[in-house]
Amino acid sequence: MDWEHQQAPSLDDLETLARASFASLPSEFRALTGDIVFVVEDFPDESVMRDMELESEFEILGLFHGADLAHREAGLNAPNPTMIFLYRRPILDYWAEHHETLGDVVRHVLIHEIGHHFGLSDADMDAIEAKT
């Protein structure tokens, strides 16, 4: 590959990759989220840093924000849409330091953000990753 003319993936590139990765996940797993919005930012904002008690903006790759399953099953409308925040710079740093494709990294972040929010075990999430 000619790296001389390559650039790091943009915010839009990562959003496109996130949509494709999400679409490749098993339908029963995707159904947990309902309609979802992907928000890609370079770094988490100050409120996320404070709320998550992070010392560095590179400590977090993504964040799920939405109603839990019990809230949705009760038919209660969530005040905000379900969103997954992906943090571009930390994701790119992780990608550069590991032997995984960028698509695999993004898919892993999506699975773990959704899975942790809905209480799935690490074994459950590993099984979902194995299916993709």
Located regions from the model:
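Active-site rim/adjacent substrate-binding subdomains
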Residues: 1-105, 117, 121-126, 132
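Catalytic glutamate of the conserved HExxH
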Residues: 109, 113-117
